[in-house]
Amino acid sequence: MTDSASGASAVANIATPSNEPYDATRKQKSLDKTARIPIKIVPAEKLKKPEWIRVKAATGNSRFYEIKDILRANNLVTVCEEASCPNIGECFGKGTATFMIMGDKCTRRCPFCDVGHGRPDPLDANEPENLAKTIAQLRLNYVVITSVDRDDLRDGGAQHYVDCISRTRELSPATRIEVLVPDFRGRLEKALDILQACPPDVMNHNMETVPRLYKQARPGADYAHSLKLLKDFKARNPNLPTKSGLMVGLGETDEEILEVMRDMREHDIDMLTIGQYLAPSGHHLPVLRYVHPDTFKMFEEKAYEMGFTHAAVGAMVRSSYHADQQAHEAGFA
């Protein structure tokens, strides 16, 4: 297997966006979302999914439908659903979820992600209370709170994060809270100042991919800025763990992944996740390689050699997948 499949033949039917008039308030998904990004997606031959890519479905006696009902009753959104995470059956089945605050419309158009794009709705003032009550109702020992990007807000949504963290701690003081934050680009210092009022137990922000692929995969984001976010948070909170995640399969090389891992350690990032990118649809960035389990094992071994306190590395690993277990094994929960 080569490090990159970027030379795959571009054979695919090119679809066009819906003919509906453009409405910034409407949530755009799939082609409607990705058709407007600056660097167009180059179709590639679809690769056959290898046998080691296996998704665990929810079992008949799991809490899958109970969790969905509770979320709907409390007007809450999960990234598990919005991003079409392949692990949703397993996680919901075990009674865990990653809560997505501040709505379901992102101000960015990252073409690897299945979260919808559009002009976000105003913040829901009741969301911190609803979230905290749901976490208490589910009796969760560990929760992950993430969000869409909110470039429309002067603080990027930092105060809303603080409101959610503080209310959750009031109702569930024993619950550990990990946040998976956006990059707060253009308002980083303001956001970090606000988060200092009530910092999380684990600070997570995903680098996602290698710097060479940023313009293609993360339009609107900046590699150095994302590293700075985590380093600056760590400088303010030296006893709190920082965490970041990467996808493989977008056209990067193994050495580029290792170089990002070195950059992470140079910026005091403690915990690492690496997983296989799986395209949500034919209108998202194509999978250019399926990384072999032996290569994931190599990444894991190198991570511990570099000094990461914990490395969750494998095809089906996602940033918040088994996050409680990751934090426990790293000695933080």
Curated annotation (Swiss-Prot):
Reaction catalysis annotation: [[Fe-S] cluster scaffold protein carrying a second [4Fe-4S](2+) cluster] + N(6)-octanoyl-L-lysyl-[protein] + 2 oxidized [2Fe-2S]-[ferredoxin] + 2 S-adenosyl-L-methionine + 4 H(+) = [[Fe-S] cluster scaffold protein] + N(6)-[(R)-dihydrolipoyl]-L-lysyl-[protein] + 4 Fe(3+) + 2 hydrogen sulfide + 2 5'-deoxyadenosine + 2 L-methionine + 2 reduced [2Fe-2S]-[ferredoxin]
Subcellular localization: Cytoplasm
Any one GO CC term of the record: cytoplasm
Domain named Radical SAM core: residues: 91-309
EC number(s) from the headed UniProt entry: 2.8.1.8
Binding residue positions for [4Fe-4S] cluster 2: C106, C110, C113
Main location: cytoplasm
GO terms, molecular function: 4 iron, 4 sulfur cluster binding; lipoate synthase activity; metal ion binding
InterPro entries: Aldolase_TIM, Elp3/MiaA/NifB-like_rSAM, LIAS_N, Lipoyl_synth, rSAM
One Pfam family linked to the record: Radical_SAM
Region (Disordered): 1-29
Swiss-Prot/TrEMBL cofactor(s): [4Fe-4S] cluster
Tree of life domain: Bacteria
Keyword Zinc tagged: no
Name of the protein this chain belongs to: Lipoyl synthase
Organism: Ralstonia nicotianae (strain ATCC BAA-1114 / GMI1000)
Gene encoding the protein: lipA
